[in-house]
């Protein structure tokens, strides 16, 4: 744009017709502030039929089923189906769903090439985010190819298949990237219809068929426990993106990027780092006292919603204990975790119990997962929950656009040198 003398004169005439400028108050706000809560704490930001967090003070339900019942009676695939479609699958529906998941376990060639170019030094969360973007290019969601132009391509997939490909494909992509850069192997990630996501992931990660049922069960239960948790930051991010009428892959990329942040994801990795600082014979009480005195952030304890207990914690704690007692287990890790918990509850003023992340750390370690993979496994699980919320947000059909409380300066006159011009 060019702003010569004639243009400036024209704009002055336009502004003169607009009337007096509305001045901000001295407090900086042009209107009385509406209800405001930092971090949206306690704010109801939408409706959902997917999950209740904190029912009865410390309960957790997916589509009306308690987390305890689901962990006792279901595998992750059944829970993913429940979250996305609203009901637990019949045996026939589950068989069909497993077959569809298996179709997407082979990593596409273009994705393999990309993964081979992502260095081992990269954050595994960035690997998954990049995988999601690449899959969105290779298999665009039908109806979301372009704005106002062609809405599908020969490689377009349905919304349903887009979700299925992500839930099934994240684990194999992560394992392919890891194997290529640690051993130089281009692994075949094909599976079978009856192989669970947990079993398939461990087989590809550890490169062995000899995996104990206890380890498979632990990872499977963790996927159920991490699958959904209401309007958590990543889920809300996916809903915001969805509300703009964007595609599935963009919404999931938003969620992954949000979960990458250490205040949302990464707590189980931080818990493992804490546990690794001690040995069984160490003065854990003294070490924890020092950390608290230095006001260090202790991850793996407490939750914004659960004030008494995290209902998921006892389930994963039992898995950690069972693994520690098995052949080749790490009883030292479980013992150290127990002592840290005991000391924390003794020293911490509010007596906040451990959350899901704390005992997940030792459980994942005993399953053979590298610590940087803890949060990516969270992604594999939570993609099912994100899918449910994306579908729900699309049905709502309203753009999420909250207001903000202005705290900047009040109205100011232009500097003298600008007035003169």
Residue spans for each PLM region:
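Hydrophobic alpha-helical bundle cores within soluble ligand-binding/oligomerization subdomains
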Residues: 26-421
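N-terminal mitochondrial targeting presequence
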Residues: 1-31
């Amino acid at each position: 744009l060019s702003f010569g003398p004639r243009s400036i004169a024209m704009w002055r005439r336009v502004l003169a017709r607009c009337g007096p400028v509305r001045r901000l108050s001295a407090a900086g706000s042009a209107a009385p502030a509406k209800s405001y809560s930092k971090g949206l704490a306690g704010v109801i930001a939408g409706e959902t039929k997917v999950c209740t967090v904190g029912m009865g003070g410390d309960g957790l339900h997916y589509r009306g089923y308690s987390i305890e019942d689901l962990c006792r009676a279901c595998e992750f695939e059944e829970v993913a189906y429940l979250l996305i479609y609203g009901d637990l699958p019949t045996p026939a529906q589950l068989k069909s769903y497993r077959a569809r998941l298996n179709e997407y376990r082979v990593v596409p060639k273009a994705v393999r090439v990309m993964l081979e170019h992502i260095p081992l030094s990269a954050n595994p969360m960035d690997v998954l985010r990049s995988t999601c973007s690449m899959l969105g290019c290779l298999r665009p969601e039908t109806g979301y190819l372009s704005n106002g132009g062609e809405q599908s391509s020969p490689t377009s997939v349905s919304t349903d298949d887009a979700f299925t490909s992500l839930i099934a494909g994240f684990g194999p992509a992560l394992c392919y990237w890891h194997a290529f850069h640690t051993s130089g192997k281009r692994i075949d990630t094909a599976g079978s219809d009856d192989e669970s996501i947990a079993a398939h992931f461990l087989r590809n990660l550890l490169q062995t068929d000899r995996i104990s049922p206890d380890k498979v069960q632990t990872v499977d239960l963790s996927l159920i426990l991490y699958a959904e948790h209401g309007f958590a930051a990543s889920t809300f991010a996916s809903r915001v993106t969805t509300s703009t009428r964007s595609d599935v892959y963009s919404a999931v990329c938003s969620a992954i990027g949000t979960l990458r942040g250490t205040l949302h994801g990464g707590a189980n990795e931080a818990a493992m780092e804490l546990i690794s600082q001690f040995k069984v014979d160490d003065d854990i009480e003294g070490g924890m006292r020092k950390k608290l005195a230095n006001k260090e952030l202790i991850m793996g304890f407490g939750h914004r919603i659960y004030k008494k207990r995290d209902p998921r914690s006892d389930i994963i704690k039992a898995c950690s204990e069972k693994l520690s007692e098995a052949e080749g287990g790490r009883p030292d890790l479980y013992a150290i975790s127990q002592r840290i918990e005991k000391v924390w509850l003794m020293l911490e003023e509010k007596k906040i119990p451990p959350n899901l992340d704390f005992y997940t750390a030792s459980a994942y370690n005993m399953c053979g997962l590298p610590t940087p993979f803890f949060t990516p496994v969270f992604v594999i699980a939570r993609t099912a929950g994100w899918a449910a919320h994306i579908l729900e947000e699309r049905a709502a059909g309203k753009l999420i656009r909250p207001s903000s409380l202005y705290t900047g300066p009040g109205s100011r006159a232009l500097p003298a040198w600008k007035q003169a011009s």
